[in-house]
Amino acid sequence: MLAIGSSIPNWIVARDSSIAPKYPPVGLQVYTLGFLLNAPGADTRSILKQIADIGIKEIETATGGNGLYYGQKPKVFAEMAKDTGLKWIGNHIGGLPRTPAASATSTAARPRSRNLRDNIQEIVDDAAEGGCSWVICSSSAISTLDEIKRTAEVFVKAGDLAEQNNMRFAYHNHQSEFDQIEGVTAFDYVLTNTDKKKVFMELDLAWATAAGQDPVALFKKYPGRFPLWHVKDLDKTTGRPCPVGTGKVDFKHIFTNSKLSGVEHTFIEQDGAKNIDDPASSVQWLKNNIYK
């Protein structure tokens, strides 16, 4: 584990004169296989074994139909992952809740999902119980400048609490973080109004590309702030997520310049994957074209 705030990943540095791996292990955001893990009666352990069998080494989790950690307690889920040869790096959780739209049927009485603003201590405690090294915000309300500012305030608290528990905090982007709102973007506001040693980004390479951003230019603008990546591709025609290497994201350009980003963990993600063959083909493409 790197010291808090370090921008040089441990996989870059050779130890005992040996040659260090060129890139981090291939990981998976298991949201990709939510249709399996969230199915009624899903055999979590068996599905994790299938994930390991396609060459995945590290995983992230996300809330789904079976609840947090796919119906398991954090420690139990962590043991399942470890037993199948997987390392559980972090879990996605929402940030600042969006204000529900007014409607004839009030949503005020409905229980609100756990989120960083309201449940940060519980979320960090769960991550610690599972042995995770990262607390990750999956998305947050950022449609107004006020929401952007309040989101940044929540992230400051999350970064502080994660550090106190020997973990780190990161924010996962979509396209909307790059929209101009009153002359600023949520992406720039968060990165320039939080401590670079406590608040990091999990850069979704596909959504950044879809927003017209060059990930390498972002690395240069904010060096060391991107220790986590979502390795996602987008179909050249439809713009929808597709297996890595079959779409329009320039992964060779991005990986070649990865050192500047401070990347430590990379997670394949494919929204709408139809079966485990989709991430399996992404793993194979990366091994053949990037990790060779």
Over which residues does each language-model region extend?
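Aromatic side chains
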Residues: Y31, I56, H92, F169-H174, ...
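Acidic-and-aromatic substrate-binding clefts and catalytic sites of carbohydrate-active enzymes
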Residues: G34-G41, A62-K73, G95-A101, P111-R117, ...
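Hydrophobic faces of well-ordered beta-strands that scaffold small-molecule active sites
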Residues: P24-V30, I59-T61, W88-I93, V135-C137, ...
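Non-transmembrane, interaction-prone segments in cytosolic or luminal domains
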Residues: Y69-Y70, P74-V76, A81, W134, ...
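Active-site acidic/histidine proton-transfer and metal-coordination neighborhood
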Residues: A3-S7, S18, R98-F200, I276
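N-terminal pre-domain/capping segments
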Residues: L2-E129, S133, E163, Q284, ...
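Histidine-acidic metal/acid-base catalytic patches
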Residues: I4-W11, R15-G27, F35-A52, G131, ...
